[in-house]
């Protein structure tokens, strides 16, 4: 049977860059699914896109579906029909499921069969509903109506091309009827252009100054950037997020180089980069030493012959942005950073939790607790409290109000300008770290104190007013904050504090402000929240679920302790299999026979020599395990437990535990209880698999 290609183009006003990229991903699964649901055989599906279009091309679609004759076996005849031969509900349901009347059922060999016939259908008659499903099936963050129509899409649709081979598919949506006429680049080749066959659509679009795929446009841009780098000796910064956006803003990208006045380089580098990347989608260029230059890359979407005009226009735009940035920076420097703190009373942190000034005071109070718990020096403690006092002050400066992504960074510059110590300035800059998974933590203990106080204040506050994460919803990114806190407690130079104690201190500060909440309930929620996040982190790091659950079974509340205990168990399992085997075996033998209700008060006078040896080993292990746990030396604790394998094996070999003498029997069971009791302070070894 002859096969044709399907080509479907949705022509629109410019779709937002990230929405376009997401729509392409959806169409890669949506289009084949709709064809499968319609029982239309097909070959490979290709998705193309530009800011003004989405294109679906599907190869190897037959002109008609296959005729089918099928036989389906149903229930037994005894179940399908009653004594009078009438179809039962079982027969009716079976027939209905196969799309036939119960009278058409056939009985053979004691069973009911349904014979169905599916005639061949011209595929062209089925495709209209498939195309409708494609348009309606794309999920958009925001969609809109236009004109007098009631249908929705990301942006107004201006044309459809719908071809099956050379035949136009009858299709109408939002008052627009599909035809064979596409459009090209809005300015370079507006069209319309006729498309004779589905296989030609993409090439017609390409010839009309449209690079029709995200991957191709990115390749064009990267090649242009590489050419600029080779000519200038500079290096471009291409953040992934900005690159995706630029790729989906231009249908026919051209890489150009612009410049700005060198005087603007007196402004902090971060604010210049923010102005270019975040506001204008320009890529900054750096010299060989990594220093920002006064040149930048702009990706044009116009006639390459007009490059000078495009560059001039973009230079005027960036000049205006940088003039504003320099003005704001200079104005902010006229006042010491501390003078901005009181203005934080005008900025709401959270409706029920007060202002940013309230938050600043809590951060400072929590920082006081943390420096004491961590045992920081007097100098570091003073710097931490000073940084806590100033860390949010730049939020009300003109530069940060205009360029929000440089919060913290500008505060650092302003702090240095008014004579704060380097450590205070650095802590202000870094207290938002880590911003995402894998991001660097603050470099100093002072920075970690302020960062942890800030994040923990947010978590405890939002939990106290019932705004903790639920399901997949986490509008305040509390999970990310929790991961950041755990990272600061487990990094190369960690902040050594009790997180549970810090949670108590944070909740106490909220209580002092008159925030009403159930302290015990919120405390429990927050601790469980951190433990849950830590469990996920361990699982994602490849740690055994059994090891994680074994440690959690002994009510560990500190994330750092959970991590270290699990790592010790995993290390023993991987690198010291004999130790791990001894742990598991020793525990299992005793745990299988113990009687917890008898307690562990052993009568030494009733012990034989072998029993006494085990009792002494247990007492010694209790002391050594306790010392190891106090020192957070979990590997040593495991070694001490594994050393009990010999005494317990000898005990089972030489001693009849279930003695007829009740006193002896119960005393031996108490000894086993005490033996197991040494283990339960470390982990529940019954949950471990070998």
Residue ranges and their predicted role:
Residues 1-690:
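Amphipathic alpha-helical "coupling" segments that flank catalytic cores
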């Amino acid at each position: 049977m002859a096969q044709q290609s399907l080509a479907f183009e949705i022509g629109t006003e410019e779709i937002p860059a990230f929405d376009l990229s997401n729509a392409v991903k959806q169409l890669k699964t949506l289009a084949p699914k709709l064809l499968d649901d319609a029982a239309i055989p097909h070959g490979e599906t290709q998705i193309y896109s530009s800011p003004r279009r989405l294109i679906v091309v599907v190869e190897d679609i037959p002109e008609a579906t296959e005729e089918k004759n099928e036989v389906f076996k149903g229930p037994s005849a005894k179940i399908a029909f009653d004594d009078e031969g009438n179809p039962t509900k079982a027969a009716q349901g079976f027939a209905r499921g196969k799309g036939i009347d119960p009278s058409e059922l056939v009985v053979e060999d004691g069973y009911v069969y349904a014979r169905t016939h599916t005639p061949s259908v011209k595929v062209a008659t089925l495709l209209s509903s498939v195309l409708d499903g494609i348009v309606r099936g794309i999920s958009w963050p925001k969609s809109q109506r236009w004109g007098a129509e009631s249908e929705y899409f990301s942006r107004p649709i201006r044309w459809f091309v719908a071809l099956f081979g050379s035949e136009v598919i009858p299709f109408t949506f939002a008052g627009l009827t599909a035809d064979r006429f596409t459009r090209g680049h809005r300015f370079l080749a507006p069209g319309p252009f006729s498309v004779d066959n589905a296989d030609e659509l993409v090439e017609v679009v390409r010839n009309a100054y449209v690079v029709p795929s995200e991957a191709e446009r990115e390749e064009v841009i990267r090649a242009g950037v590489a050419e600029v780098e080779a000519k200038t000796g500079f290096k471009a910064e291409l953040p992934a997020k900005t690159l995706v956006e630029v790729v989906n803003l231009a249908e026919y990208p051209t890489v150009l180089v612009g410049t700005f006045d060198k005087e603007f380089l007196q402004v902090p580098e971060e604010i210049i980069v923010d102005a270019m990347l975040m506001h204008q989608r320009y890529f900054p260029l750096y010299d060989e030493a990594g220093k920002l230059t006064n040149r930048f890359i702009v990706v044009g979407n116009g006639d390459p012959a007009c490059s000078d005009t495009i560059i001039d226009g973009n230079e005027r735009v960036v000049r205006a942005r940088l003039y504003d940035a320099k003005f704001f920076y200079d104005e902010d420097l006229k006042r010491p950073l501390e003078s901005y703190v009181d203005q934080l009373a005008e900025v709401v942190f959270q409706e029920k939790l007060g202002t940013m000034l309230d938050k600043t005071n809590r951060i400072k109070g929590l920082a006081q607790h943390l420096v004491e718990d961590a045992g920081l020096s007097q100098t570091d403690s003073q710097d931490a409290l000073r940084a806590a006092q100033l860390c949010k002050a730049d939020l009300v400066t003109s530069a940060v109000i205009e360029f929000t992504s440089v919060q913290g960074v500008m505060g650092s510059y302003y702090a240095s300008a008014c004579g704060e110590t380097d450590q205070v300035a650095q802590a202000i800059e870094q207290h938002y770290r880590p911003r995402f998974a894998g991001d660097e933590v603050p470099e100093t203990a002072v920075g970690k104190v302020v960062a942890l106080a800030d994040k923990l204040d947010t978590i405890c506050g939002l939990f106290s007013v019932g705004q903790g994460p639920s399901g997949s919803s986490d509008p305040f990114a509390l999970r990310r904050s929790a991961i950041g806190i755990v990272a600061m407690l487990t990094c190369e130079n960690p902040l050594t504090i009790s997180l549970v104690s810090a949670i108590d201190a944070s909740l106490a500060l909220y209580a002092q402000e008159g925030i009403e909440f159930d302290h015990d309930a919120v405390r429990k929620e927050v601790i469980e929240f951190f433990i849950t996040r830590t469990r996920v982190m361990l699982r994602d790091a490849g740690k055994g679920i059994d090891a994680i659950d074994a440690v959690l079974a002994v009510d560990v509340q500190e994330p750092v302790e959970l991590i270290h205990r699990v790592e010790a168990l995993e290390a023993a399992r991987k690198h010291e299999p004999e130790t791990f085997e001894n742990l598991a075996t020793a525990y299992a033998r005793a745990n299988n026979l113990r009687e917890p209700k008898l307690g562990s008060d052993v009568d030494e006078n009733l012990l034989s020599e072998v029993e006494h040896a085990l009792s002494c080993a247990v007492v010694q292990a209790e002391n050594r395990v306790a010392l190891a746990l106090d020192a957070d030396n979990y590997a040593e604790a495991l070694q001490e437990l594994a050393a009990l394998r010999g005494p317990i094996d000898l005990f089972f070999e030489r001693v009849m535990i279930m003695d007829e003498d009740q006193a002896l029997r119960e005393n031996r069971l108490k000894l086993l209880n005490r033996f197991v009791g040494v283990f339960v302070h470390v982990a529940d070894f019954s949950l471990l698999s070998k």
